Amino acid sequence: MYKRQGWYEWQRQENIKTPYFHFLPDNLLYFAGIYNLSSGCAVVTCESANNISHIHHRQPLLLDENQINEWISGKHEISRILDDQLSFYQVSKRVNSPKNNDKELLYKI
């Protein structure tokens, strides 16, 4: 499980990539994850929620606080109860460079 403020995703239209920040208003997000000692860790993804599918076809599998123990204990059929609450907005293309790492990357444009 990964606790995050949100995530970036890029909408592609021909040769143009537009970055968006996805988040849950007034809450942190918990991403479902997997871990293996020899190969490391990864965020589990799923098909995008209807309200963000026009930006990208996949998103992290989101857990609410009540689903965390279910995920950790091995229940892998998780209801996607947070999907309808997701919000997003366009952000600066500065997020495209790993050289940039400041709070302004989260600013709405």
Where do the PLM segments sit?
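A structured binding-face within diverse protein domains that lines the active/interaction site
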Residues: 3-109
